[in-house]
Amino acid sequence: MQDEFYIRRCIELAQKAIGNTYPNPLVGSVIVHNGKIIGEGYHHKAGENHAEINAINSVEDKSLIPESTIYVSLEPCAHFGKTPPCALKIVELGFKKVVIGAMDSHDKVNGKGKKIIHDAGIEVVSGVLEKECIDLNKRFFTYHEKRRPFVVLKWAESGDRFMDKDFKPTQISNSLTKQFVHQLRNNEHSILIGTMTALRDNPSLTTREIVGRNPIRILIDIDLKVPSDFNIYSNEAETLVFNSVKEGEEGNIKFIKTSRENFIENMLKKLHELQIQSIIVEGGSLVLQQFIDANLWDETMIIKNKNLVLENGTKAPRFSEIPLEIQDFRDNVIEFYKNSH
């Protein structure tokens, strides 16, 4: 129970950097001496100190370290990247014990960090709150194990399951829901829409309702029908345009030529190559349905305005899963789903 308490604190610390560590995972670390936390830290962003190093640096009396336990939510790294291996630093400082939440499935780690520490004669325990630690880095693990980005589907629908009225932009989500969605955009690496959504709504796909980073924008526009003066082509964020016409870069816009056959699968493969760890798919209905039919999704979020009846327009995607959780947002509800297949 004591180990779980400190690993839970590691998770809390790691969550402070959601959306900022790509392509690295979220990691938190706590150092405990005689039942008292004497140091803690988390990984802030790629290229900067890892969680363990920040925790070590925060310890005022370094002489206590050989009699201390270091807790870390993810297996310490074992390779030289932009920073030296944390496993070697832990061995060098001679910690009494190391407690790990989840093992790191990345090819360069994958048990090597734990082995370095164990071979140095330091007691190592792993798998503490493993499920929670894996869920913390669901994007990172999906990216490395499934070799594709973590996919979140999101749409808003009326009580009679339409996404708009008369195929025109229609207000379905309330202001509270919009804030929540913009937080989600800040958390995910990229955001994706199709041609029809770009033409009809002319969205900028930036994070406006809260203070935060803009995700990488992804546009599926097979025949390049979206005019270059539309908001998606603004210089506010890096933008990838998957199409069947041309390849090349123009400022912050990258055109990626992709075969029409197995388009979604080929696009996800390319996004993996580009180190995009997660995408939120915001529409339209046809694009969302393609992801659903191919079973290429990890989580789905449906915003429902049950009191709104639109009678006609774009029909919401066909989706028959059972929600894992339902939250009220005033006159909206949001249903959350996880793919168990």
Language-model regions: role of each:
Residues 106, 110, 126-129, 144-148, ...:
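Short capping loops/turns at secondary-structure boundaries
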Residues 20-21, 50-54, 76-81, 144-146, ...:
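Short acidic/polar alpha-helix capping motifs at helix-coil junctions
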Residues 31, 36-132, 216, 290:
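Zn2+-dependent cytidine deaminase-like catalytic core
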Residues 3-25, 40, 60, 64, ...:
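Enzymes that bind and transform nitrogen-containing heteroaromatic metabolites
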Residues 21-35:
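N-terminal glycine-rich anion-binding loops that anchor highly charged ligand groups
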Residues 114, 130-137, 178-185:
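Hydrophobic, well-ordered secondary-structure segments
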Residues 113-115, 139-142, 207-209:
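Short low-complexity, flexible loop/linker segments enriched in glycine and/or proline
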Residues 20-21, 128-156:
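Proteins enriched for Cys/Gly/acidic motifs involved in redox and nucleic-acid/cofactor modification
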